[in-house]
């Protein structure tokens, strides 16, 4: 039984590692162009915790983990996160554009 558990652990380790890093790596330069076009109106404001209208809090996404950003954008797109503006924007993005934006913001 002990050998079985060890063998199973060794066999599953690469699978679990891959699952955590399965988000495709994007192109930061392409992400910057997309960010300027659609994201900077809210996320590009100095002091990113407020934007127009001031009642909405805009999170700081610069320096955030790229995988987290992709997951968050997908959550907006499929309705798991509730923000109509972000849902509309995320729904218009291709998978490669999600990865590009995430790569750009993760390097800020």
Model regions: which residues?
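Residue-level hotspots at or immediately adjacent to binding/recognition sites across diverse folds
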Residues: 2, 20-25, 89, 104
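Sec-dependent N-terminal signal peptides
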Residues: 5-13
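Periplasmic/extracellular electron-transfer cofactor-ligation site
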Residues: 23-26, 32-58, 78-85, 107-108
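Soluble non-cytosolic domains of exported or imported proteins
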Residues: 29, 33, 63, 92-96
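Stable alpha-helical elements in mature extracytoplasmic
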Residues: 35, 65, 72, 82-85, ...
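A structural feature that tracks compact, well-ordered secondary-structure segments
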Residues: 59, 71-76, 89
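C-terminal capping alpha-helices of c-type cytochrome domains
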Residues: 67, 78-81, 89-108
